[in-house]
Amino acid sequence: QSVLRAARLGLPLMVAIIGGSPIQFKPLFELYEKTYLDSGHDPATMRMGVHAHAFLGEDDKAVSDKYFPLYAAQMDRVGRSRGWPPYQRQQFDFGKTRNGALLIGEPNQVADKILYLRDTFGLTRFAAHMDVGGPQHKDLMKSIELFGTKVLPQVKGD
């Protein structure tokens, strides 16, 4: 209902994709776009975005090995109240693939995935949630730096 309401009112859409496969959200974006246009809004003003968990490092294996325990601990904290089984490395590794919801790894990997999401959904916005699991401040600052200096130029320049 919130997708329809936002579209009818001409409001922007931001979808949190924090698990599973992003492609499963495609019908929401299609519904929003159709309803937005059918409601008479200007296509040039349509804004759609994705919010996703992200974390970057210079080396994929190193950042993944360091970040996984923190991320898993947070997912387990959330999952306990929801009856989820413990978060596994397989889930994390799948999440990092093109078909998964995580944007974790080297800058080129993250940029490629943002471009894939943009092209798949017609995105105009992307929000990276980088502090999931409470990484060390220096690691978080490095992730933000890499996002700004390495990912953004690729995404904006495309």
Predicted regions and their residues:
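A cross-family glycoside hydrolase active-site/sugar-binding cleft signature
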Residues: M14-A16, G49-H51, A127-H129
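A conserved active-site cap/scaffold subdomain adjacent to cofactor or substrate pockets
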Residues: Q1-P22, F29
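An alpha-helical appendage that flanks or caps ligand/catalytic pockets
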Residues: I23-T124, K156-D158
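Short catalytic/ligand-binding loop motif for oxyanion handling, primarily in non-cytosolic enzymes
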Residues: Q1-V3, G57-D59, P135-H137
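Active-site-proximal loop/turn and secondary-structure-junction residues that shape catalytic pockets
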Residues: G19, A54-L56, V132-G134
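Long, low-complexity C-terminal extensions of enzymes
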Residues: P107-F147
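C-terminal helical cap(s) of enzyme catalytic domains, especially alpha/beta-barrels
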Residues: F25-E33, Q136-G157
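Solvent-exposed polar/charged
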Residues: A7-R8, D119, P153
